């Protein structure tokens, strides 16, 4: 599907960028692809990736999604875009809301507009469960990003730039997530700081995140949102699982919820569940393709919103301690940390 094509990954030196590049290299997709453009702000991370991967198919572009010109210049000749650049730390976004808006909303606008201008065939935008019923700035900014993508998709046919969205749960061991924090605290002999023990989160691996984006890329139609069905765990069980894996007896200290945190997350709202298509491992949420001429819908009638629950980390499959340990031990990050323990 990428034969002789050019792919651009915004925020390409982050957790997702590293994961998708590893997949391409291990599966030999890299041999078929014409070029992969890594677009990001951090020259040090680009240099580290350049040295670590040392592949002539990788081209590096310094730039910021906030700057339309840099995005536009990097996108000349690009066939496909994975838009992963974002500010994603919930407390940070609470304190600096305009920074979140500038990157997650206006930056996305720049990426989508440049893709349309440069006649990119397909863009897959990476979103988050926090965009569903958002209560924090990060979730609000990602919800607006989704709305931007869908609004632009609504005005385009399948023969033009196709815009679709993937919505993630918690990606385990991604940069800035709780698993690296707990492991560092365990190895340093510190107390494990738990916000709220009964808080639940979806558990999704970096491998899952790549699978979701590639599935959306292959199957996505104009304005689609794709969600992967994922199990969940309480924060307390996750911490205990890591303690058991590392043979730790560190004390646990409860610190209370941080700025902007929710007790549980939702991946699909009850409103979207009414129109979601169950694809086995995934949900596909088609866009609402109606225009602003509402009069005809009053005459023709409107599909009733189904009385369904939203799909949340509280009502999905809940993993017990042994299941969480088994899942954690499949992660390369945890395996490497165990070797270095």
Swiss-Prot record:
This is UDP-glucose 4-epimerase. It catalyses: UDP-alpha-D-glucose = UDP-alpha-D-galactose. The lineage of its organism: Bacteria, Pseudomonadati, Pseudomonadota, Alphaproteobacteria, Rickettsiales. Epimerizes UDP-galactose to UDP-glucose. It is an enzyme of class 5 (isomerase). Belongs to the polysaccharide synthase family. It comes from the Bacteria. Its EC number is 5.1.3.2. The gene is capD. Keywords: Isomerase, Lipopolysaccharide biosynthesis. GO terms for biological process: lipopolysaccharide biosynthetic process. GO terms for molecular function: UDP-glucose 4-epimerase activity.
């Amino acid at each position: 599907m990428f034969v002789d094509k050019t792919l651009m990954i915004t925020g390409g030196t982050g957790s997702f960028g590293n994961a998708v590049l590893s997949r391409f290299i291990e599966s030999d997709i890299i041999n078929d692809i014409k070029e992969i453009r890594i677009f990001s702000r951090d020259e040090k991370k680009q240099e580290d990736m350049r040295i670590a991967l040392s592949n002539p198919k990788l081209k590096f572009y310094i730039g910021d999604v906030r700057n339309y010109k840099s995005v536009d210049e990097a996108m000349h000749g690009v066939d496909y875009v994975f838009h992963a650049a974002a500010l994603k730390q919930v407390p940070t976004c609470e304190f600096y809301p305009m920074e979140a808006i500038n990157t997650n909303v206006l930056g996305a606008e720049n990426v989508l507009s440049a893709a349309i201008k440069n006649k990119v065939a397909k863009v897959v935008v990476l979103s988050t469960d926090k965009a569903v019923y958002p209560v924090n700035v990060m979730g609000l900014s990602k919800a607006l990003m989704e709305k931007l993508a869908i609004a632009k998709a609504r005005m385009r046919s399948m023969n033009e730039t196709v815009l679709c969205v993937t919505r993630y749960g918690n990606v385990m061991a991604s940069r800035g997530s709780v698993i690296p924090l707990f492991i560092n605290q365990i190895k340093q002999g510190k107390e494990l700081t738990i916000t709220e023990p009964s808080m639940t989160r979806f558990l999704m691996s970096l491998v899952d995140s790549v699978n979701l984006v590639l599935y959306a890329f292959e199957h996505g139609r104009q304005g689609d949102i794709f969600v992967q069905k994922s199990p969940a765990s309480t924060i307390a069980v996750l911490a205990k699982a890591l303690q058991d894996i590392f043979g730790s007896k560190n004390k646990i200290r409860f610190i209370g919820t941080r700025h902007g945190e929710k007790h549980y997350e939702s991946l699909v709202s009850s409103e979207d569940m009414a129109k979601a298509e169950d694809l086995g491992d995934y949900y596909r949420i088609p866009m609402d393709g109606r225009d602003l001429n509402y009069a005809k819908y009053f005459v023709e009638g409107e599909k009733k919103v189904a009385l369904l629950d939203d799909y949340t980390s509280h009502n999905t499959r809940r993993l017990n301690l042994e299941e969480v340990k088994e899942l954690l031990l499949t992660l390369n990050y945890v395996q490497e940390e165990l070797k270095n323990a």
